[in-house]
Amino acid sequence: MRNIIVSTILLFIGQMSWAQTITGVVKDTANSPISYATVVLYSLPDTTYVSGAITNREGQFKLTAVESKQLLLQVSSIGYKTRYLPATTDQTIVLEQDVVSIDEVVVKGTRPISKLISGGVQINVANTVLSGIGTGNDVLKRIPMITGDNGRFKVFGRGDARVYINNREVRDPSELDKLNSADIERVEVISDPGARYDATVAAVINIQTAQKPGEGFSFNARSSFYTGENNDYINQISTNYRKEGLDVFANLYYSNISSLLKGDISQIIDVDTLWCQNSYTNGGMRSNTLNGTVGVNYEINENHYIGLRYDIKTSPQKNTKDIYLTSDIYADGVLYDKWKNRELKRTASRPVSQVNLYYAGQLGNLSVDFNADYYCGGTDTEGMHVEMSEEFGERTLYSTSHIDNSLLAGKLQLAYRIGKGKLSVGSEYVDISRNDEYSNKDLPGFTSKVNVDETNLALFTEYKVLTNIGNFSIGLRYEDANYDYLVDDEVADDKSRHYRQWFPNASYATKIDKVELQLSYTSKVVRPSYRELSGNLAYGNRFMIETGYPFLKPTVRQDLSLMIVWKIVQASVRYVHQKNAIVTWIDRFESDPKVSVLTSRNLHELPKLAAMIAIAPTFGIWKPQLSCGIHKQWLDLTSYGINVRLDKPSFFGSFNNTFDLSGNFMINLDAAYNSKGHLSTSYIYKDSFLVDCSISKSFFDKSLQVKLAI
């Protein structure tokens, strides 16, 4: 068959000696367009790379061959069989769904399928069970390597992730709850972010949405009620108007959410007396949010896109935090005191405004991507701290806090194809201003006024090239970051910082039979915050105060990782070396040794190892996903002449189950486990186990969904 294809190409191309434009559309067997399919043009007979493209949301692509050559097209997309065919113009290419057999069990490509991309893994969501799971939060919770909820997520082995939607940074965590899972095309989990991302970003989650079909008006309404130990409410209405290349949208979202805080804390201080404080925490927080969004996207033509979005967010009522702490204090095993503490905070939020402007374009072989953000807002908080001691009586402490924040950010990236590769260059600028005033008239020395001005100018470049032995990528980022701190309107030279640093990254990806492998190296940084540098005292209780350490150095992090994807299996191994690791540290208060000081310190080094594996098969209506992994660190400390080894590994596992039933019913049963173990300078001394269950039914061709969750 290959000989016939090549002969046809020779016959067709032999008559042409000028530049050609190869166009077409990629569809599935149901005649639906396949967006984001990869189309690569090769010359024959040596299969030299000529050009490549990604299909748009209508499945269309366009390629240019600048010389007279014998040409071959390779068309591929996750979940479909790859096709090779002669390169002609205005052709319709149909891809068949991929089906593999594992031990006599047929596994179809309707399950979210993993695919290695530069720096991470891409997960297909459209046309899978995840597309009907609920919200963006629900989708991310069921993707391997990701943990978290409510817009705040971590990537396994890396830490906190920065979330993007269509390459726009998400600055409001509630935005993921507003995103319908049916609107998500795919999710990119970038565990090794390259030079185009901020050097402080440990991981990236990039959500790509699908363009809604059709023209005219569309509406979407959602109302959710959750009950248990507390009641939560979410109401949302969205509307769109689409006409040709114009897309106008608006969204109104209200939430009233409660969260419970419970736990046991033991604090032991061994000085001239052995002090032991056993505490029980019980309380909760309630927050309410009203968020409005309006925006417009405009497709000028197939090569130029522009968009503008405005968000405003406020809290109609004050958000509250009400925590009770009951403590028993022992001195050398003898009861010393009992107390009950109550911490009550009421926060009023001033309206938060955010504006985003973007442009994406293609000028021949040059692609342009520009994003700009402006953000401003603030809060006012009133606090009350009540201490009721059996031995020392009762006292009440009052505090106030006033915070103003603003941000201006812009990023420009240019990409140009050179030979078989693509060269990207760009620049990013961020300007952040924060004013923080804290007053506690009942405790002298606990009042402060701090102004923080942070600027960061970055230049970056990346080059990616496809070769016969695999894909290579190399990048370099330079950052000039300036942190100016004013305390009580005076410049704080001991805390202000100016960093000029280089951050390289590199990766190599290849495919051996059906196994995809990627080896990556990245260099990142963790810079100390003002709170970690400040010498101001923050009151906790009679036995605990918090302060910073002005001599902290930035943590330089070196990561080496190996990622593997084979059919429905995904695995990774990561080694991390942190120099000058910033860790939480507990010291003694100089004037009163029984009082602990919670602060930060640098460790000379902190090496870690993380490994995980996930498998996601399909057995008829049952679609399970099993993940497990291990964290291990090597840390020996000496404090006050005592040697401590903190190297006990911790394990985690999750088992998510989706049952896609007839009648548009769906059942989800999810379980997660985390073991005891050391985490930096802390020890998690209890295993945790969590189970979630939900059942949902869709009506009116999936335009209405009713869901019951426990």
Q: What are the functions of these language-model segments?
A:
Residues 45-60:
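Short, acidic Ser/Thr/Gly-rich low-complexity loop/linker segments typical of extracellular
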